[in-house]
């Protein structure tokens, strides 16, 4: 605990006075699933109708009838636990189950080609410093920035009084796009643009809607105990839509960017400190293709400027806070260090919502 306190004191005052921490909740996995999210919903009722209405604007009109009809029918394909959680959220919020399910599969429906995608992006960074510590930084950028800031929450998923895994997510959303299994690994998801509407729809039917990516990440965090197991699951499993899945572990070279198509990994790009590849930067572009993304270029320049020898959690915050890595669409920033003895506490304390 003393080490955690020292590290937190060293976080720079790059976070402006308007930055704030997300609300923290414990989701008790020993409770009936239909009751787990009740307090979260009660605390955010005033924001929920606006979020749902805004979400509808980002579903292309040709897809809207299918999406909302299908969303009201497909929860039966999810695990029983997820089904019951969704029904509980719908009941507590007073919103139709179709709208709740639709919110939770929005990424999977909308992750199509760049010409039609709404403003969705992220920056994920994994770095190994000279002491061997693995540090995972993440900015989540999203077009509904102001609305999402009001419903961003930090959740510890607890069983038998012990934190099993943690995640940054949103009220109404029981999946996870940014998370950590304490003492083992952390994960973040970035959008990857590949294919067209019909490709996602066909894959959804093929998988019988069983694997929305946010539910899958949560499942991996709960059931895959190690970095190696998690990377294997993230690389091999069929998913609805393309994505970049970034994973950080606790041992040498345990950091990877998995560029996913719908079937499996299209590319796996790991840390390799022996070849001086001590950091990985992923935004929303394939790392093996030429591209001019200013966020990625700036992050790489900043990492090289700071250097590996003295790189630490404070340094990662500095990279995440540099414009345009941090930009007008950034909802929150976080730093995860899964190898810390108090990694769950650190994750909770090292997340901030931008003003």
From Swiss-Prot:
Any single GO molecular-function term of the entry would be: hydrolase activity, acting on carbon-nitrogen (but not peptide) bonds
| Annotated glycosylation sites | 150, 160, 328
The protein's name in its UniProt record: N-acylethanolamine-hydrolyzing acid amidase
Pathway(s) of this molecule? Lipid metabolism; fatty acid metabolism
Gene Ontology, cellular component aspect = lysosome; membrane
Instruction: Describe the processing and modification events after translation.
Output: N-glycosylated. Autoproteolytic cleavage at pH 4.5 gives rise to the alpha and beta subunit. Cleavage gives rise to a conformation change that activates the enzyme. The same catalytic Cys residue mediates the autoproteolytic cleavage and subsequent hydrolysis of lipid substrates.
Reactions the enzyme catalyzes: N-hexadecanoylethanolamine + H2O = ethanolamine + hexadecanoate; an N-(long-chain fatty acyl)ethanolamine + H2O = a long-chain fatty acid + ethanolamine
Q: Where is the active site?
A: 122
Broad class of where this protein is predominantly found: other
Q: Which residues form a coiled coil?
A: none
Give the stretches traversing the membrane. none
Q: Name one Pfam family in it.
A: NAAA-beta
Family under the similarity heading: Belongs to the acid ceramidase family.
* GO BP of this protein: fatty acid metabolic process; lipid catabolic process; N-acylethanolamine metabolic process
Keywords, sorted A to Z: Autocatalytic cleavage, Fatty acid metabolism, Glycoprotein, Hydrolase, Lipid degradation, Lipid metabolism, Lysosome, Membrane, Signal, Zymogen
Q: Which residues form the signal peptide?
A: 1-17
Listed InterPro entries: Acid_ceramidase-like (IPR016699), Acid_ceramidase_N (IPR029130), CBAH/NAAA_C (IPR029132)
Question: Which subcellular locations apply to this protein?
Answer: Lysosome; Membrane
Assembly and interaction partners: Heterodimer of an alpha and a beta subunit, produced by autocatalytic cleavage.
Q: Where is this site: Important for enzyme activity?
A: 138, 284
The free-text function statement in the UniProt record for this protein reads: Degrades bioactive fatty acid amides, such as N-palmitoylethanolamine, to ethanolamine and free fatty acids.
**Upper lineage ranks?**
Eukaryota, Metazoa, Ecdysozoa, Nematoda, Chromadorea
Describe its membrane topology: Peripheral membrane protein
